[in-house]
Amino acid sequence: MAQALGEDLVQPPELQDDSSSLGSDSELSGPGPYRQADRYGFIGGSSAEPGPGHPPADLIRQREMKWVEMTSHWEKTMSRRYKKVKMQCRKGIPSALRARCWPLLCGAHVCQKNSPGTYQELAEAPGDPQWMETIGRDLHRQFPLHEMFVSPQGHGQQGLLQVLKAYTLYRPEQGYCQAQGPVAAVLLMHLPPEEAFWCLVQICEVYLPGYYGPHMEAVRLDAEVFMALLRRLLPHVHKHLQQVGVGPLLYLPEWFLCLFARSLPFPTVLRVWDAFLSEGARVLFRVGLTLVRLALGTAEQRGACPGLLETLGALRAIPPAQLQEEAFMSQVHSVVLSERDLQREIKAQLAQLPDSAPGPPPRPQVRLAGAQAIFEAQQLAGVRRGAKPEVPRIVVQPPEEPRPPRRKPQTRGKTFHGLLTRARGPPIEGPPRPQRGSTSFLDTRF
């Protein structure tokens, strides 16, 4: 299924903004203005100048100072002020600090610290020839107009090759999924290869476990959850999709597996990632629901899509003006979907899955709900790892010396008064009695 889904991960022409492909290297050697890169590194992109929704420089500077303060005391911030972190992530992490903030949010810095030298060993080791061939065929497809990935021998494509190869060696039972390519490429645009690798590990194993394996069992489960949420939140859209036969697996894997990297303008992609690394997979559902509503929310839009092809085209051809980062993310965060609601729906759909479904059963319980849950789990693991186990000690006491038998006091033939006198010492003699000078009674009587 991974290969089948991977072949469809091609961005439609209508959404090819600054992350689109122009086709060949000959076009990159055209006139000077055409080769100019925008502020995100895309050649010929439309983001060279800040857009109308871009915050002013003073506001960006204030946000940068807030992030510097929060990241300087990260453990204290996450322990006591996570709500502030979430709010700042929703406003957007400043571009200059994403390289510092993304590894902290996803916990990649802890993984890298606990596994020193692991990435270097994986990067230097020879890869599986099967996976290396597949990865090599996909390298030129990942943002070919970005200045990092223009040349096959450039540091961008070579770094992407090393990161993806390292993951196949790190998790050989999962191997390589084509959707990991754009995810790793976006990470490499902001991070060194080692940090990008550990962020990719966290995304694949903590945020979205079961997404990039050979069976993609978690993608199937989340597709059913998404349809259930559509039925509850957008019933008219859900009915239309059912009538024209558009199932969630026809459009959702491209969105969720690539974290919308191929479906949205690049500035909006970064804002989605900021929120996703903070709040977890719930953000993906909110973004997906927003896209469906923008494409098919009105009766006129649904009436213009009488069949399957027209409906899929509408989902992939949302006007870029509606996907501008500030306005779009405001709609995303207004979607009423709490983590409790999402978990309740996941449990309900998990109970309805047939036992004959291919592959292993999904394990949604291993998915952590964002940066706060990851931080708490890593703190708990650190406490357990740092606590030294008590080594049992056998203490042998020396034998006690035998005590002499207790002797009974010799009281035979002795009065109690004598014992008290002996105990108290000799009696104290008082003053001598005066001698009476008179005659005794007997002498006077007789």
From Swiss-Prot:
The record marks 137 as: Arginine finger. Residues 18-33 have a biased composition (Low complexity). GO terms for cellular component: cytosol; ficolin-1-rich granule membrane; filopodium membrane; membrane; plasma membrane. Residues 406-446 are annotated as: Interaction with calcineurin. InterPro entries: Rab-GAP-TBC_dom (IPR000195), Rab-GAP_TBC_sf (IPR035969), Rab_GAP_TBC_domain (IPR050302). The record marks 178 as: Glutamine finger. SUPFAM superfamilies: Ypt/Rab-GAP domain of gyp1p. Keywords: GTPase activation. Residues 1-58, 384-446 are annotated as: Disordered. PANTHER family: RAB GTPASE-ACTIVATING PROTEIN 1-LIKE (PTHR47219), TBC1 DOMAIN FAMILY MEMBER 10A (PTHR47219:SF4). Interacts with both calcineurin and HRAS. This is Carabin. The gene is TBC1D10C.
